[in-house]
Amino acid sequence: MHVTQSSSAITPGQTAELYPGDIKSVLLTAEQIQARIAELGEQIGNDYRELSATTGQDLLLITVLKGAVLFVTDLARAIPVPTQFEFMAVSSYGSSTSSSGVVRILKDLDRDIHGRDVLIVEDVVDSGLTLSWLSRNLTSRNPRSLRVCTLLRKPDAVHANVEIAYVGFDIPNDFVVGYGLDYDERYRDLSYIGTLDPRVYQ
């Protein structure tokens, strides 16, 4: 689903007032996000239902901390097949608004994924550099299958050599926050996704 521009400006009294003046506009409302997650859950369930029945194993959702935590929680409830969670933290950001391309593992998986059907759950794919590295890393651990689901995809992601099976929204190249997405650990608690006023990070 393509989103070409911000859907509305922030007006006084909205939850953006948690951070007065920081949110420039709303890109995706909470209702739009939840409706799309329901669609993704149904699609994923249809794709994995037979595999789950054949292998007798639950679909393993590998979530990249911290931004995707809210997304994977809602997504798992929308997928009509049993799922399990694994968490991994990698970083290529620091406190900037663009990917550095330098990836380091902050937290690795707690279990072996050999022979498992794995779905990587991402919050946003921008340059695709982090996801490309993560996909190679997990592939080397010999899962039965490996696919990617991201809530948001930015234009530059098309240049990454990674197939993304499930995309929530294609969005512009704006720096976005909310619904788990942060800038310097702030704004994750917003129920919607909005664009950050450039004065915050310039």
Swiss-Prot record:
This protein's pathway: Purine metabolism; IMP biosynthesis via salvage pathway; IMP from hypoxanthine: step 1/1; Purine metabolism; GMP biosynthesis via salvage pathway; GMP from guanine: step 1/1
Required cofactor names: Mg(2+)
GO cellular component: cytosol
Regulation: Competitively inhibited by acyclic nucleoside phosphonates (ANPs) with Ki values as low as 0.69 uM. Prodrugs of these compounds arrest the growth of a virulent strain of M.tuberculosis with MIC50 values as low as 4.5 uM and possess low cytotoxicity in mammalian cells. Inhibited by pyrrolidine nucleoside bisphosphonates, which are also able to arrest the growth of virulent M.tuberculosis not only in its replicating phase but also in its latent phase, and to arrest the growth of M.tuberculosis in infected macrophages while having low cytotoxicity in mammalian cells.
A biological process from GO: guanine salvage
Annotated Mg(2+) binding sites: 122-123
Coiled-coil region(s): none
Catalytic activity: IMP + diphosphate = hypoxanthine + 5-phospho-alpha-D-ribose 1-diphosphate; GMP + diphosphate = guanine + 5-phospho-alpha-D-ribose 1-diphosphate
Signal peptide extent: none
Active-site residues, record numbering mapped to chain: 126
UniProt KW keywords: Cytoplasm, Glycosyltransferase, Magnesium, Metal-binding, Nucleotide-binding, Purine salvage, Transferase
Record's keyword annotation contains Nucleotide-binding: yes
Gene Ontology MF annotations: guanine phosphoribosyltransferase activity; hypoxanthine phosphoribosyltransferase activity; magnesium ion binding; nucleotide binding
EC numbers for this chain: 2.4.2.8
Binding site for GMP: 154, 175-176, 182
Pfam families in the cross-refs: Pribosyltran
InterPro entries hit by this protein: HGPRT, Hxn_phspho_trans, PRibTrfase_dom, PRTase-like
Amino-acid positions noted as binding diphosphate in the UniProt annotation, renumbered to this chain: 66-67, 188
Localization (cell): Cytoplasm
Family per record: Belongs to the purine/pyrimidine phosphoribosyltransferase family.
NCBIfam families linked: HGPRTase (TIGR01203)
Its job: Purine salvage pathway enzyme that catalyzes the transfer of the ribosyl-5-phosphate group from 5-phospho-alpha-D-ribose 1-diphosphate (PRPP) to the N9 position of the 6-oxopurines hypoxanthine and guanine to form the corresponding ribonucleotides IMP (inosine 5'-monophosphate) and GMP (guanosine 5'-monophosphate), with the release of PPi. Thus, specifically recycles hypoxanthine and guanine imported from the external medium, and converts them to IMP and GMP, respectively. Cannot use xanthine as substrate.
Oligomer and partners: Homodimer and homotetramer in equilibrium. The presence or absence of divalent metal ions, as well as phosphate, can affect the oligomerization state of the enzyme. Likely functions as a tetramer (rather than a dimer) in its biological environment, which is the most active form. The dimeric structure is also active though ~50% of that of the tetramer.
Extra information: Is a target for anti-TB drug development.
Protein name: Hypoxanthine-guanine phosphoribosyltransferase
Organism lineage: Bacteria, Bacillati, Actinomycetota, Actinomycetes, Mycobacteriales
Gene: hpt
